[in-house]
């Protein structure tokens, strides 16, 4: 009886101490949006972007946050292949073929 109690207690302790996988994003990855490398990142209300928004038919008042300009996707992070010689950002909307990306947040690829 004492042996059975010991076995049950030991198994319960092992089960409680077993590590579980955490679903946290890796360094240099985006929890929302896509990882992009943009030549410049500017505020949406920047005067230099106003004419570009007009050409794309975007209403300036509807755009908030940071805007990436001339962006390309970063595909390999952490394997020595992720390089961005400009500004790495996570962007929510890159539906303008890399010309601009909307809703960007700067990130650090060197973590």
Swiss-Prot record:
Subunit structure: Self-assembles to form functional amyloid fibrils called rodlets. Self-assembly into fibrillar rodlets occurs spontaneously at hydrophobic:hydrophilic interfaces and the rodlets further associate laterally to form amphipathic monolayers.
Main location (coarse class): secreted
The entry's keywords: Cell wall, Disulfide bond, Secreted, Signal
Lineage summary: Eukaryota, Fungi, Dikarya, Basidiomycota, Agaricomycotina
Family: Belongs to the fungal hydrophobin family.
Protein name: Class I hydrophobin 10
Gene: Hydph10
Xref: Pfam families: Hydrophobin
Disulfide bonds: 30-90, 37-84, 38-71, 91-104
Chain's role: Aerial growth, conidiation, and dispersal of filamentous fungi in the environment rely upon a capability of their secreting small amphipathic proteins called hydrophobins (HPBs) with low sequence identity. Class I can self-assemble into an outermost layer of rodlet bundles on aerial cell surfaces, conferring cellular hydrophobicity that supports fungal growth, development and dispersal; whereas Class II form highly ordered films at water-air interfaces through intermolecular interactions but contribute nothing to the rodlet structure.
GO cellular component, one term: extracellular region
GO molecular function: structural constituent of cell wall
Stretch forming the signal peptide: 1-17
Subcellular location: Secreted; Secreted, Cell wall
Organism: Pleurotus ostreatus (strain PC15)
InterPro entries reported for this sequence: Hydrophobin
